[in-house]
């Protein structure tokens, strides 16, 4: 498929053309230049593949991938595609094998590094048929991905020149990853959520601190995050990664700002029937009650009070995507903390008090801009730059996303 020849409308990060969410050729260029390019894609947790032979299947862009713990103790990743006729090698979301994967179609087999090691009836039957004598199994196999691990997270890349993960993230973002993922984790549950919008609309959404207490009335009503509270936005120098955070400090007279804006949740005096939902503790000892962290191009790490989750963004065509949620706690959590995390999982998730709205608004934009390919969105809140700010009344991290995106795409 030929690449799009459409140009960005102006040399600014504060205007984004709507065709970027709609153009088929541009989408296929994204898969090649971003997801198959020099980026680190999150693929699973280390605990998902804790023992030799344990595996998970996932995607890098639209490429199906197997991630497996090798007998050597390393984590390996390779394309989930049989070298014979292209069928999936592993069909389950997760599982365990002893020493090899076997394709169900023609029983070709692969070791835990993705090397082709066996061909059914390779020598034929009764002296007839079989593969050519000069067929070399080492020359055939699925594509291999390099892997790296950080704080229990597994990342993969197809590119030989992707920098080390620590360099890729930068010191400030790296420190915030370690803040939340600093101990061995335990998986509490998983969801898969289908969204009717381009993948970039969701990634913009989680980088957009401006909307959090406006779209999500629950956040504002119960003071989980409000623009009048403490906090800010950290943006990596290349724009690719970000952290937004809210510090639980008294708002004093500034709390009147939401009433003055006519925000409905501020006027109706809503209350929870069961206040235990918001029973939280300052487990990181820094008063940060909400932190959303993104790693370009497909990872979100969430801390909303004591609800911790890893979200994986998977593109599924121009106008669709999947969001894979993994709720986590720490291996040393006591029963009370585990129950608290499970209860607070009702805050943020596909059917939670908050994220139902995020599941809708991307589709609203996809539909609303359907006939506006040559028009642009306005991303001016907080100026036109991508610098970190000590306020969340800004779209700096959204502009940072487009800064990185344009660099990878050549726009």
Regions found by a protein language model. Give the residues of each.
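Basic/polar N-terminal segments that are highly enriched at the extreme N-terminus
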Residues: 1-7, 407-411
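Short Pro/Gly-enriched beta-strand edge/turn motifs at strand-loop
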Residues: 37-48, 126-131, 292-297
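Short, contiguous pre-domain boundary segments
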Residues: 4-17
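Short hydrophobic core segments
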Residues: 30, 81-82, 102, 202, ...
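Non-catalytic accessory segments flanking enzyme active sites
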Residues: 14-16, 20-60
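Short, charged helix-to-loop "capping" segments that act as catalytic/coupling loops
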Residues: 32-40, 93-100, 113, 124-130, ...
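C-terminal catalytic domain of Rieske-type non-heme iron oxygenases
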Residues: 69, 74, 145-411
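Rieske [2Fe-2S] iron-sulfur-binding domain
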Residues: 49-160, 167, 171
């Amino acid at each position: 498929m030929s690449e799009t020849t459409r140009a960005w409308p102006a040399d600014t990060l504060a205007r984004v053309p709507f065709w970027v969410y709609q153009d088929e050729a541009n989408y296929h260029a994204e898969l090649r230049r971003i997801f198959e390019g020099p980026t680190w894609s999150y693929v699973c947790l280390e605990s998902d593949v804790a023992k030799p032979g344990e595996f998970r299947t996932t995607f890098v862009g639209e490429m199906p991938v197997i991630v497996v713990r090798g007998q050597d103790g390393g984590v390996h990743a390779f394309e989930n595609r049989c070298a014979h006729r292209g069928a999936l090698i592993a069909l389950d979301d997760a599982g365990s094998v002893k020493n090899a994967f076997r394709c169900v179609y023609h029983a070709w087999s692969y070791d835990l590094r993705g090397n082709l090691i066996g061909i059914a009836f390779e020598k034929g039957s009764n002296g007839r048929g079989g593969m050519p004598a000069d067929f070399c199994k080492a020359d055939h196999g699925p594509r291999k991905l390099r892997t790296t691990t950080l704080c229990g997270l597994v990342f993969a890349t197809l590119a030989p020149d992707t920098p080390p993960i620590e360099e890729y993230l930068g010191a400030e973002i790296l420190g915030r990853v370690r803040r939340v993922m600093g101990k061995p984790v335990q998986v509490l549950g998983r969801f898969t959520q289908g969204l009717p919008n381009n993948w970039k609309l969701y990634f913009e959404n989680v980088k957009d601190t401006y909307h959090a207490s406006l779209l999500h009335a629950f956040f504002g009503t119960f003071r989980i995050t409000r623009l009048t509270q403490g906090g800010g936005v950290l943006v990596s120098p290349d724009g690719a990664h970000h952290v937004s955070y809210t510090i639980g400090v008294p708002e004093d007279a500034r709390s009147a700002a939401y009433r003055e804006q006519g925000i409905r949740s501020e006027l109706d005096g809503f209350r929870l029937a069961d206040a235990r939902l918001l029973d939280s503790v300052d487990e990181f000892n820094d008063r940060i009650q909400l932190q959303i962290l993104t790693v370009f191009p497909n990872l979100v790490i969430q801390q909303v009070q004591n609800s911790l989750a890893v979200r994986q963004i998977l593109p599924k065509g121009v106008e669709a995507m999947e969001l894979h949620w993994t709720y986590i706690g720490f291996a040393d959590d006591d029963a009370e903390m585990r129950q608290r995390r499970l209860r607070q999982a009702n805050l943020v998730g596909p059917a939670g008090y908050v994220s139902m709205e995020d599941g809708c608004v991307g589709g609203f934009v996809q539909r609303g801009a359907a006939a506006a390919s040559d028009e642009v969105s306005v991303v001016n809140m907080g100026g036109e730059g991508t610098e970190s700010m000590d306020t969340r009344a800004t779209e700096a991290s959204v502009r940072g996303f487009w800064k990185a995106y344009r660099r990878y795409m050549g726009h």
